[in-house]
């Protein structure tokens, strides 16, 4: 997949091949060989919803090419293979230095004492990658369809960031960014099948404890 929104906007053809056509090839292969298919979709399918959320699986409105391609991928794959599972994943993080994610952004900013910017009005989930891995045995057993998948929150990403810094005992300037659309998912559908995540702030606390941050 190509998950960078800017890259997809700049090259829609490459985005379509990576984010729609390749999953369709996989769906056909799984159909021919009687295999289960799990695809990662994205919370970006809610990026232009008119209400504030939290969003259930039926309430979709993509606001960029990446999101539109992910939603089309879901529909096309499920047409080919109704048993396939589409996981609408959030921004995932872990202690991994080779690729930027929320955790590494905060830790790097603490190290350099650069400021970070998050919107006090934006509600979105972020998910500890370890909890994603821990849930995969249950994901394999899910009925076909689309599922919101990740940690839930009752706080803005700005509030979460300040609480996380307090938890770490670190000082950092957190600027209030311009308003951004919520990516705030209701994950109750998947929870009915035993797929459980910590809340956003509890997931960050667990990650900090795991890595002794």
Label each region the model flagged.
Residues 1-18, 31:
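NAD(P)H-binding glycine-rich loop region in Rossmannoid oxidoreductase-like domains
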Residues 75-124, 131:
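NAD(P)-dependent short-chain dehydrogenase/reductase
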Residues 171-173, 177-213:
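C-terminal amphipathic/interface module of NAD(P)-dependent oxidoreductases
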Residues 133-182, 186-187:
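Mid/C-terminal beta-alpha module of Rossmann-like enzyme folds, strongest
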Residues 32-36:
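A short helix->loop->beta-strand "cap" motif at the edges of active sites that frequently abuts
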Residues 62-69, 99, 121, 128:
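The catalytic Tyr-centered alpha-helix of NAD(P)H-dependent dehydrogenases
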Residues 10, 18, 64, 124-127, ...:
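Residue-level signal for the nucleotide or nucleotide-sugar donor/cofactor binding architecture
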Residues 10-13, 17, 21-25, 45-87, ...:
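Catalytic helix-loop patch of NAD(P)-dependent Rossmann-fold dehydrogenases
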């Amino acid at each position: 997949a190509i998950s960078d929104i800017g890259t997809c906007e700049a090259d829609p053809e490459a985005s379509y091949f990576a984010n729609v056509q390749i999953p369709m090839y996989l769906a056909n292969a799984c159909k021919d060989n009687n295999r289960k298919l799990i695809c990662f979709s994205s919370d970006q399918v809610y990026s232009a919803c008119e209400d504030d959320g939290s969003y259930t699986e039926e309430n979709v409105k993509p606001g960029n090419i990446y999101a539109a391609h992910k939603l089309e991928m879901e529909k096309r794959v499920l047409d080919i293979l109704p048993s396939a599972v589409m996981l609408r994943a959030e921004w995932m993080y872990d202690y991994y230095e080779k690729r930027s994610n929320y955790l590494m952004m905060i830790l790097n900013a603490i190290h350099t004492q650069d400021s970070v910017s998050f919107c006090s009005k934006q509600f979105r989930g972020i998910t500890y990658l370890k909890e994603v891995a821990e849930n995969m045995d249950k994901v394999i057993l899910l009925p076909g369809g689309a599922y919101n998948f990740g940690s839930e929150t009752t706080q803005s990403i700005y509030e979460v960031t300040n609480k996380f810094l307090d938890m770490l005992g670190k000082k950092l300037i957190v600027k209030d960014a311009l308003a951004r659309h919520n990516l705030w998912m209701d994950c109750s559908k998947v929870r009915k099948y035993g797929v459980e995540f910590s809340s956003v702030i509890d997931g960050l606390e667990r990650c900090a404890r795991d890595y002794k941050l």
